[in-house]
Amino acid sequence: MMVRNVIKEITEEKLENYFKRTEEAIKIIKKGMPPKRSLLYDVAKDFLLMIESYFEDAKAFKERGDYVTAFASLNYAYGWIDAGVRLGIFDVGDDDVRFTLAK
């Protein structure tokens, strides 16, 4: 099977779109943190640390002109976001447009 319209590069426009989507998702999950007294609160903080670390790494890679690794870092960040949402660590309501919900 021949594949047509193969995209072989990550454009600045595409990268900016992923930065924007990830930043919006981070704002939403921060509002959906478990209560501080919950056993899940420390888990959520750990997830958030990983998410923000990958997001900051993506910024640094972009500044160096390494769009491929920046894009990969954003995808790792979003993977952590979706895992946290799907496990019920972050409450995002019924937002199944931005997040992969379990149902």
Swiss-Prot record:
Pfam annotation, one family: DUF357
InterPro entries: AF1782-like_sf, DUF357
Domain of life from the UniProt record: Archaea
Protein's recorded name: Uncharacterized protein MJ0273
